[in-house]
Amino acid sequence: MRKVSDDLWVYNTRDLMRASSCDHCTRLAIARELRIPGVAELVEKFEVPVAGLPIDYGMKFEADLEAELLESLGAEAFRKPEGSGYLAETIALMNDGVPVIYQGSLEHQIGRVKFSGRPDFLVRADYDLAFVDGKLTAIQDIERSSVGYIAWDAKLAGSPKPHYLLQVALYVDALAVLGLKAEGARHGLILGSRTLTTFEEGEIVPAMRQARSYILDAIENLEVEQFAFDSLSLHCDSADSCKVCEYPGLCAHNRLELDHLVQVAGINKSQIE
């Protein structure tokens, strides 16, 4: 999450994932952006670069899908925004009716809070993604309307996870605001098992809006004194939430400190917290 100005905060899909499961993540991010004394100095010790084998494998998976679609559809039917104005170019490509858009850009602002993200694939309403002979392609259904786009995200995982659906729902909602959402379509995930899974809008958007409301409420009703360092929890509510936490090392460190206090002082965690 980024504070651009007093009147604009920007969040992405991972911020929404965190907000859906852990108050600690959202509050710590807001405190960091508010420059609460002590917060930046603490979290910078636990910043983790976005790298490693899972990221490398994920990028290769996406690159393979990109190459397969380009080979299948050709350069005119499979496009990627190339300039600096990704959002404007993405909208232009959709208005031009390009069948498949790779790594486009979508935004949606409510009050002082703006979502900014990049769906892996935006597919025109009259096309279906499909694996043919093990390779990804898009097949046109000429009986369907070509108006609007369907959001797809690629995930290396072999099965859908709840926070993946929040991402897709954000893209669906942003398309709707632009008036470029395919009506009645099922949006979905391209999984590492080379299978597709789809969802109706009503299955995924309500949960996204609930998670988003936590971010909106926190920013729209923001009072700086509520984010004083001493009021912040320094670990996720559960170890499972650390899978999407910005500072998992801080969580582990803080839990270790609390366990040490319990052992030394003979008190329970509820007394510490």
Segments (PLM) and residue ranges:
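Conserved catalytic cores of phosphodiester-cleaving nucleases, focusing on short active-site segments
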Residues: 115-140, 145-158, 171-173, 268
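Conserved structured core elements
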Residues: 59, 115, 162-165, 169, ...
